[in-house]
């Protein structure tokens, strides 16, 4: 049974923004992920626990965006006008802590670790899109930094169910506890 200490646990939501949602191909839809993440966020807020909303973003000229040559570039050719915005169902509030990242992981080049440590956080509940990219990069970094991790499996999605399931079944069990949103809500 999962037990979480409300005083030392934070929710970190990865890339739930309008420009990323279309890339949720499975096994959970973007709407399912956002609604479940919204339930988690509401519970954390009601308990006075911190909610971190992490977004990826660059300047208009993409000066600081990654540009290395790769075999499988991002499928995004043009970003929609509202690509930065959090979906309404996430219920973002002024009490949420915004983190802007420019890499896949939420720790590199941001003050996320500082924000967590100064609040006495030792456990992170992690969710978002994509399971195997932004969420996994953040999870790996968090584990390397000594944080306890809980992955909200049904509040994550990837480009395909296969990509999602690879992270859920093979990577996360080595660095985290993988649970449903319902199990996490019951543990808070």
From Swiss-Prot:
GO terms for molecular function: hydrolase activity. Pfam families: Isochorismatase. Its EC number is 3.-.-.-. Keywords: Hydrolase. One of its GO terms (cellular component) is cytosol. InterPro entries: Isochorismatase-like_dom, Isochorismatase-like_hydrls, Isochorismatase-like_sf. The keyword Hydrolase applies. Belongs to the isochorismatase family. This is Isochorismatase family protein YecD. It comes from Escherichia coli (strain K12). The gene is yecD.
